Amino acid sequence: MPYLTGTPATTACTDLRPGLGIPGLAHPLLASAEWGALTRPGAPVHWAVLNVADGPGTQPDPHCLEAAGRLRNAGVRVLGHLDASRLDTTRLLGTTRLGLPRLGAPAPRPSRGGGGRILSDLMSEAQRYVDWYRVDGFYLDRCPVERADLHETRRAVGTLRALRDKAHIVLGHGTHPHPGYAECGDQLVTFSGPWSEYRWSQVAEWTADYPPGRFCHLVHGVPRGHLDEAMRIARWQGAATVWFTDRTDGGGRVDPWESMPGYWDDIVSRIGTGVSE
């Protein structure tokens, strides 16, 4: 893709076998059994997101440090959660270095996160994740999807890679972004939402140019009886990393990712034995 000039994604996901991406369990004090289940032998977990307090928090949390250490010892990548929706690209595109409106620049658009955020703030959080929890990479939640935001996102990812050697970067778009993002992150979350939408979802044609290890699907509200169907959809659409749960978002009132699915043993056995293939 000739318009891309940033740091390319790594090739670590090229031969990735089907497995699980854990988008964010509750704090280890509230979900100690769930965190422990991720380290059980044979659990096909690709990575788990650590979100201490809407970020790394203001001081090291010993419970999170212990949970992260156990995951790493079990061979599971630990990713620090960063809110990428507050990367305010219009702040840079629409102002001068002095912060004055650039002549002819459009009026700033409010970001989805409810306010601007300079890159240094995001990097400060990332550095705390590295220093306190020794994370293996980062999960950029609510990552932008438009081409206009690609440059700033690529800039942020490049800085993150400088903070952590061999950092694994997952871009949590939640939908198919502009194809240029595939050259930015190691994995892209191209679906995040309810089963009622996933079962009728379509895949973007450009994803066929990349191996399944580059894509992830996160689906809540999947009934136990439709688990095999969900896994077939992921295989057909070319996503090697998945997270399916029967938990729901309660109409937007509950985080469906905070607890384990009721069929945890079933999904581990299905993916671990290659049922989806």
Annotate each PLM feature:
Residues 1-277:
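Glycan-processing catalytic domains of CAZymes
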